[in-house]
């Protein structure tokens, strides 16, 4: 039993970088009402998926899945103090991983982060254990802002606006199951939003930023999270705007936050451009998750790229946005003299392209396999780029 639970935890963390890009998406209330009526009257792929999801909790991992906000979670524990398990589930902790990683990449790109290995090596160093420990705590606090607060706010507000769709696909989720009240949801959204701004202000002060860069990033991220999920803009209803909003929120914004925590004044225009480009790769990751939900998206009026262009065209848009972005970044690093980093990044693209061979043959059934095989290389490619930026003098 313990081995099974441990395995679920490891898979959840590994899946965390791509899971956020595939969580529930829905259209306007009017479209949902029209679409959900026939779906509720007949067995659909979504109904089957929900049934399978609920059955997964029987393997003994339902409790852990609940805490991580994953499918197959067990029912809520009404005896939990302040309903904390349900509240935590609503923030989907498994989806915090990419933002935490983004903060780490931003810290690396700052060129001013003192890691543990700075205390060792052949070259003399003036770093002390105190400096290393302080920077570690700074990075951790920035990760708390990006993960529990900002991502938690995003997932909570997204679940609220997706509550009708979740009633079919994931009826055990906190909101459709009635495990948490409307007032409790509103209070959680308010707490996470206000908490994000307060924490960001404190981090700006700790970092010594003359202008509240981190607070501005937090405020902008909160705004993007709202217009992504809520009408009338509801960016997620459009394949292009929705997927790019996700990509930028999970790559560019936490990167900037991590950098600003250690050296806000050194954020250069080329670095901003690189992170925005990597957000295009994030768009490709998001498309991977859209292939299995084509029928549901079409019924709900969701104009995802596979719906808009068809599977054959969308799959090429997907891999092209991922590969061309990374190869373009590698070419840029080579051009500015960071040849070793460029070579490593190009090398990390190759296994991704190899995994895309089977994905392109059947993107509907090979999406999970592709994500598991390719995404780790993309993630380390982002870190490689960050290290190159930190090493280079612009």
Feature names for model-found ranges:
Residues 19-55:
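N-terminal, immediately post-signal peptide pro-regions of secreted/luminal proteins
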Residues 1-31:
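N-terminal chloroplast transit peptides
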Residues 42-394:
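Multi-pass alpha-helical membrane architecture of UbiA-family
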Residues 11-13, 37-38, 151, 348:
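A composition/secondary-structure signal for short, hydrophobic, low-basic-content segments
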Residues 4, 32, 60-64:
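Short amphipathic alpha-helical segments that mediate assembly, nucleic-acid/protein binding
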């Amino acid at each position: 039993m313990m081995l099974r639970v441990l395995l679920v935890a490891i898979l959840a963390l590994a899946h965390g970088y791509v899971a956020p890009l595939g969580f529930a998406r829905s259209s306007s209330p009017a479209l949902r009402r029209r679409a959900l009526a026939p779906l509720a009257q007949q067995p659909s792929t979504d109904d089957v998926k929900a049934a399978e999801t609920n059955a997964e909790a029987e393997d003994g991992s339902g409790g852990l899945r609940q805490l991580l906000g994953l499918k197959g979670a067990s029912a809520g524990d009404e005896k939990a103090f302040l309903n904390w398990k349900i509240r935590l589930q609503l923030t989907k902790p498994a989806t915090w991983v990419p933002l935490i990683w983004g903060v780490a990449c931003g810290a690396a790109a700052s060129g001013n982060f003192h890691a543990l290995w700075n205390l060792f090596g052949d070259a003399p160093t003036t770093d002390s254990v105190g400096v290393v420990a302080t920077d570690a705590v700074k990075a951790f606090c920035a990760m708390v802002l990006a993960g529990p607060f900002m991502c938690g706010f995003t997932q909570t507000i997204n679940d609220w606006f997706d509550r009708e769709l979740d009633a079919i696909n994931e009826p055990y989720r906190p909101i459709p199951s009635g495990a948490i009240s409307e007032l409790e949801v509103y209070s959680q959204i308010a707490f996470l939003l206000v908490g994000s701004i307060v924490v960001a202000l404190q981090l700006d002060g700790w970092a010594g930023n003359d202008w509240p860069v981190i607070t501005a990033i937090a405020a902008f991220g909160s705004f993007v999270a709202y217009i992504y999920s809520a009408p009338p803009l509801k960016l997620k209803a459009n394949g292009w705007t929705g997927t790019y909003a996700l990509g930028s929120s999970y790559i560019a914004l936490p990167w900037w936050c991590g950098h600003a925590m250690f050296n806000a004044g050194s954020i250069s225009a080329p670095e901003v451009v690189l992170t925005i480009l990597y957000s295009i790769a994030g768009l490709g990751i998001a498309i991977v998750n859209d292939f299995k939900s084509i029928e549901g998206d079409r019924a709900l009026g969701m104009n995802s790229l596979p719906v808009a262009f068809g599977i054959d065209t969308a799959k090429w848009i997907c891999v092209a946005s991922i590969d061309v972005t990374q190869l373009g970044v590698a070419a840029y690093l080579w051009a500015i003299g960071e040849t070793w980093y460029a070579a490593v990044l190009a090398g990390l693209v190759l296994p991704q392209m190899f995994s895309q061979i089977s994905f392109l043959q059947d993107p509907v059934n090979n999406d999970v396999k592709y994500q598991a095989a390719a995404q780790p290389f993309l993630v380390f490619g982002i870190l490689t780029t960050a290290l190159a930026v930190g090493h280079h003098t612009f």
